[in-house]
UniProtKB/Swiss-Prot annotation:
One of its GO terms (cellular component) is cytoplasm. InterPro entries: Aldolase_TIM, His_biosynth, HisA_bact_arch, Isoase_HisA-like, Isoase_HisA-like_bact, RibuloseP-bd_barrel. It is an enzyme of class 5 (isomerase). It catalyses: 1-(5-phospho-beta-D-ribosyl)-5-[(5-phospho-beta-D-ribosylamino)methylideneamino]imidazole-4-carboxamide = 5-[(5-phospho-1-deoxy-D-ribulos-1-ylimino)methylamino]-1-(5-phospho-beta-D-ribosyl)imidazole-4-carboxamide. SUPFAM superfamilies: Ribulose-phoshate binding barrel. NCBIfam families: 1-(5-phosphoribosyl)-5-[(5-phosphoribosylamino)methylideneamino]imidazole-4-carboxamide isomerase, PRK13585.1. Pathway: Amino-acid biosynthesis; L-histidine biosynthesis; L-histidine from 5-phospho-alpha-D-ribose 1-diphosphate: step 4/9. GO terms for molecular function: 1-(5-phosphoribosyl)-5-[(5-phosphoribosylamino)methylideneamino]imidazole-4-carboxamide isomerase activity. The active site is at D8, D129. This is 1-(5-phosphoribosyl)-5-[(5-phosphoribosylamino)methylideneamino] imidazole-4-carboxamide isomerase 1. GO terms for biological process: L-histidine biosynthetic process; L-tryptophan biosynthetic process. Its main location: cytoplasm. Belongs to the HisA/HisF family.
Length: 240
């Protein structure tokens, strides 16, 4: 199972939110590229980047720090937030991004997801952010009637590389991930699932790894910044 350190970008800085509330942002590093290099030095194999402003604006906002990370870090990175058309997908992949994460458009324009997955095999993931089992879009600001598993299954044959499943009520709360919901989703689809939201300790990571659903990976942010999770130790434990 791959551990993805998260760098959430707001106003050019690396921050963490609680439950996705933009007014509850804690700045952890005003130099996101330096933060990324710290994670790489600790041995991470991937980086998970989110353009928070972009998620609300519907277009890239924090392009400069993302580009700096891509230029300076030699590990693959995935990015979500504000990627809602083919031109933006192509632009990011041309700049060296390994994988785009499509969230809002997966609900509003699923054909774009399928088109992108066909055009760029292995480089398109679907981000499913949920509150109480229902999908939320536009930076988690809008809740839909779409159920998580229904949305995931609709992309079963689309060729997407992964589903990144975030439980909004767990995100940034340091209360542990929603292991049951994540495992249920992973069992329901053949697409690799990456867990996000609530990972707060090494025990949480081990529980996800051992949940019996063959998760592809887990994303952690606040726990790494707060020191509740030691990245080197976590990477070693997951390899072991």
């Amino acid at each position: 199972m791959i551990l993805y350190p998260a760098i959430d970008l707001k106003d050019g800085q690396a921050v963490r939110l609680v439950h996705g509330e933009m007014d509850q942002a804690t700045v952890f590093n005003d130099n996101p590229a330096a933060q990324a290099l710290e994670f790489v030095a600790a041995g991470c194999e991937w980086l998970h980047l989110v353009d928070l402003n972009g998620a609300f604006a519907g277009e890239p906002v924090n392009a400069a720090p993302v580009e700096a990370i891509l230029e300076q870090c030699k590990v693959p990175a995935q990015l979500g937030g504000g990627i809602r058309d083919m031109a933006t997908i192509e632009r990011w992949l041309d700049k060296g991004l390994a994988r785009v994460i499509l969230g809002t458009v997966a609900v509003e324009n699923p054909d774009l997801v399928r088109e992108a997955a066909r055009a760029f095999p292995g480089k398109v993931a679907v981000g499913i952010d949920a509150r109480n089992g229902r999908v939320a879009t536009k930076g988690w600001a809008e809740e839909t009637d779409v159920m998580v598993t229904d949305l995931a299954k609709s992309f079963e044959d689309a060729g997407v590389a992964a589903i990144i499943y975030t439980d909004i009520l767990r995100d940034g709360a340091m209360k542990g991930p929603n292991i049951k919901a994540t495992a249920d989703l992973a069992r329901a689809v053949s697409i690799p699932v990456i867990a996000s939201g609530g990972v707060s300790s090494l025990e949480d990571l081990i529980a996800l790894r051992d949940c019996g659903a063959s998760l592809n990976g887990a994303i952690s942010g606040r726990a790494l910044y707060d020191g509740a999770l030691d990245l080197k130790q976590a990477l070693a434990a997951l390899k072991g």
